[in-house]
A protein has these predicted regions:
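Short, well-ordered coil/turn segments that N-cap beta-strands
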Residues: 14-16, 37, 67-73, 101-102, ...
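N-terminal basic/disordered segments at the start of proteins
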Residues: 17-38
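Hydrophobic faces of well-ordered beta-strands that scaffold small-molecule active sites
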Residues: 18-21, 39-41, 73-77, 104-106, ...
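Conserved, mostly hydrophobic/aromatic
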Residues: 31, 108, 142, 175
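Acidic (Asp/Glu)-rich catalytic clusters
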Residues: 32-33, 60-70, 97-98, 116-120, ...
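Glycine-rich, proline-tolerant flexible connector loops at the mouths of alpha/beta enzymes
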Residues: 40-58, 77-84
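Active-site-adjacent beta->alpha loops and helix N-cap segments on the catalytic face
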Residues: 50-60, 107-119, 155-169
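Conserved small/polar residues in nucleotide/adenosyl-binding loops
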Residues: 182-184
Length: 184
């Protein structure tokens, strides 16, 4: 049985969210136990974290656990999607929504437009770091396309991140603190 989703209101622009990578359900639960506000995880296909092989069922169990403790679960669907994979990708998105996923990290603009049509407004869409966002203009454009949050390029300095934030104070921005080298 799916638990109730956490408060889906977006954090204030001054709120910092601790978002941790989760190789699998157990790692995600451990991150939540140690204070993570949210975790991101890959499904078995279509994401940069697909090698972990997490089933929809496992992600659903992680969602139940996370929601019990007021945390959220974000799923990466951020690889290049080919024509022959498009419908399977949308089917996976529907399955993940059904088990309680709170957000998707996407990089394919065509996929994003279709995902926005099929998921409820309570499910957030985040522009993945694979979008390589380095300017406020690109971040603004991604927001205009329907993304709720933009994950900035990993190489940006704190000064560059602040510059984007100062131009777009209402847009949720996400930045890697320890790059992609730290895995729980």
């Amino acid at each position: 049985m799916q638990s109730s989703p956490p408060n889906t209101q977006h954090p204030s622009p001054n709120t910092i969210e601790l978002l941790a990578p989760a190789k699998n359900r157990e790692c995600g639960m451990a991150a939540i136990d140690h204070g993570a506000d949210a975790v991101y995880i890959g499904a078995s296909r279509f994401g940069a974290r697909q090698s972990a092989g997490n089933s929809v069922e496992d992600i659903g169990k992680l969602c139940e656990y996370a929601h019990r403790y007021g945390a959220t679960v974000h799923v990466t669907i951020n690889t290049i999607i080919y024509n022959d994979e498009f419908e399977d990708t949308l089917a996976l998105v529907r399955e993940l929504v059904a088990v309680g996923v709170d957000a998707f990290l996407l990089q394919d603009m065509g996929l994003m437009s279709k995902v926005r049509e099929i998921v409820p407004d309570t499910v957030a869409l985040h522009a993945s770091t694979q979008c390589d966002t380095r300017t406020w203009e690109k971040a603004e454009w991604l927001s205009q396309q329907g993304f709720d949050r933009v994950v900035l390029a990993r190489e940006l300095s704190a000064e560059e991140i602040n510059g984007i934030h100062s131009r777009l104070p209402e847009l949720e921005l996400e930045a890697f603190v320890h790059l992609s080298l730290i895995h729980i």
